[in-house]
Amino acid sequence: MEAIIAIAIFTIGIAGFTLLFSKTWQGNSYTYELGKASFAASQGVSKVVGYVRKARQGDDGSYPVRSAADNDLVIFSDYDKDGITERLHFYRSGSQFLMGYRKPSPGLPKTYATGDEATVVIAENVVNEAGVPIFYYYNSGYPEDTENNPVATPANVWDVRLVQILIKVNILKGREDDNVPLSSFVEIRNLSDYDRIGS
């Protein structure tokens, strides 16, 4: 009888240890995967910051910022450093943050066809809630002018001088408390230089 009780206690102990180990492993696995996803998204956002910072006039003479909405931004920038200015289209589609690009026509005058030529994934597992856009835009009065900043969207492209990028990343829906926010402010260098020259 004592042997049966000892075996039962031992079995319960093993089952408890196995359950504890399993839960710990699942928790660590989730943390590790979320960390990987956040790191990859952070690298993608850093690239976007560089492209936006170096926005410039399109090869067809277009203003550096083509359109500026909550989850959609179109600028001109030489993203692949080949001396040719591409039209870059940053937008959210489902849980992905994407960049579409389009090179200008080879002949003269230069033109940009409609639509994106190709698309690159900037970040995955994006979980921004409704009412939390990816892009916020600020005019030249920021940070002193907090009443008119961030500017209303879709923004008047002539007003945009500073862009805030905010994405929230999570590998599991329904765990909003674990969302990892990644935020960065970027000044459009060519436009701020223009403000200094014009003043």
Question: What is the predicted role of each segment?
Answer:
Residues 67-68, 160:
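A generic fold-level signal
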Residues 64, 87-89, 185:
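Short, surface-exposed charged micro-motifs
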Residues 27, 58-59, 175, 196:
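Generic macromolecular interface patches on structured domains
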Residues 43-67, 82:
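Alpha-helix exit/C-cap motif
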Residues 33, 81, 127-199:
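Short linear sequence signals and composition-biased patches located at protein termini or domain-edge surfaces
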Residues 1-54, 197:
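Aliphatic-rich helix starts adjacent to a transmembrane/signal segment
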Residues 68-148:
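Type IV pilin-like appendage domain
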